[in-house]
Amino acid sequence: MPADNLPEAQSRLIDDEPSQSVKVSVLSSEKLASRRRWRHLSDKTAKVSIAVGGISVIVAILLIFAYLFYEVVPLFAGATVEEAASYDLQDSSASLHLAIEEQSEMAMRLGDDGVARFFDLESGENAATIAVKVPSGATITSFALDSEQSGLFALGLNTGEAVVARYAYDTRFAQLDNRRILTPKIDYPFGEIPYTLAVDKPLASIALRTSGENMMLAATARGGELSLLKASKQTSLFAAFDLGGGAEFEIEERRLSGMTLGGEQLFIDGDRFWLFVIDDEGLARLLSLRTAFTAPNPQFELQALLTEGRANPTDISFLLGGISLLVGDDQGAISQWFLTKRDDTVALEKIRSFQDSATPVVSLSPEQRRKSFVSVDAQGVVSLFNTTARRQAFTGQLAADGARALAISPRGDALLIESGRGQMALWAVENKHPEVSWSALWSRVWYEGYSEPDFIWQSSAATNEFEPKYSLVPLSFGTLKAAFYAMLLAAPLAICGAIFTGYFMA
């Protein structure tokens, strides 16, 4: 029967049959709307939270990068030098040595008349004038400095004698304002009596090196005879109760009449193993001090030419520690030399050079706490160098009239220059990180005591004489190696975990 002919009730039932499959929620329309709003809010909150979290991570990484950039960039910054004061000491004697006190409050100038003048570093006001105890009628013919740290020096006399003295400061603090008060002094740790190195012959050159209570002197007389002397302090058991002294010196001498020298300069290394004899043309000959006192006929064991071409040395000085020898010449070049050992063969090798200018180098002054030094040339151009980093931190003309001498403070924060006219100029120095350079971080560096350049990381040691080694290559290689071995274990675990999770979720 056609659907059109069905009764109305039956037709209504047929039309209503599909509606029986629709599931009607038991919740009211208000609760459904509330649930939808809550779901929408949760989705929105999660979306914002994830976005904020991701952006925060990126911002945090950028801030870390900015902080590291802020901390690292100053490591490569150069030094700054600013004039602090200038004054005239009114001293006509030639300068043998300039030195600055530990905290840059006072300075000392030793003249060729044997008088040490101590003065305020900022004002130039005289604090004390002390004459070294030189025998009556004797004149100074040569000078040698042990090291800037010890303050010990030797004066060679025209009588063939040598006086060993030390400049120092006694420190006390005022009771009212706790102000630091310095009292300069010249003392004689190895006795006031001069040491005889030649008989009635002026000492043309002299070298001094000390270690604790032991001292070694080397000198050449005008005739060319080389003399060696060792002195060791012998303290008696009752020295603590003897206010008058109680100390004696055991002295050992050796006159090497078979070695006739000319006007060579003498230097003793920091370990007192070698005597460097350097002539005016830069030829260095080395005598072993371990056998010089006992061998019947000691001879020079090593030799090397310290200059290139027709250059002649103008100033020579040991770097901090007494291992490296700095040589400045009349062509403006500065070179670093030290002894190396390969297969039981010892050689004096040129490690690196610093070409500052074509003007002759006048003076070299090593720092007391870092492997750095200061140079000044004949035109008054001052440069700050670091040997390990092979870096020139500063260069500038600070003495228009030329320079006679210069000194850098123990902390490296002050520079004192005596000009060609005898005026003193004090300069404030800020040179925080001279030992950092791109080559020191990523290239092979030839460190003191090593036979060849190498990648080494060793940032500190027990003494200031240590040469810091900042190569990042060992650290980077170690980090990458550790990451590689970690990935060998982490990668299989991650892959297997992903597979397991995928099957579990399925």
Model-derived regions: residue spans:
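WD40-repeat beta-propellers
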Residues: 116-121, 162-167, 226-231, 284-289, ...
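Surface-exposed loop/turn positions within WD40 beta-propeller blades
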Residues: 104, 113, 150, 158-159, ...
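Periplasmic/extracellular loop-to-transmembrane helix junction in inner-membrane transport proteins
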Residues: 33, 37-45, 75-109, 114, ...
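Hydrophobic alpha-helical transmembrane signal-anchor segments
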Residues: 41-72
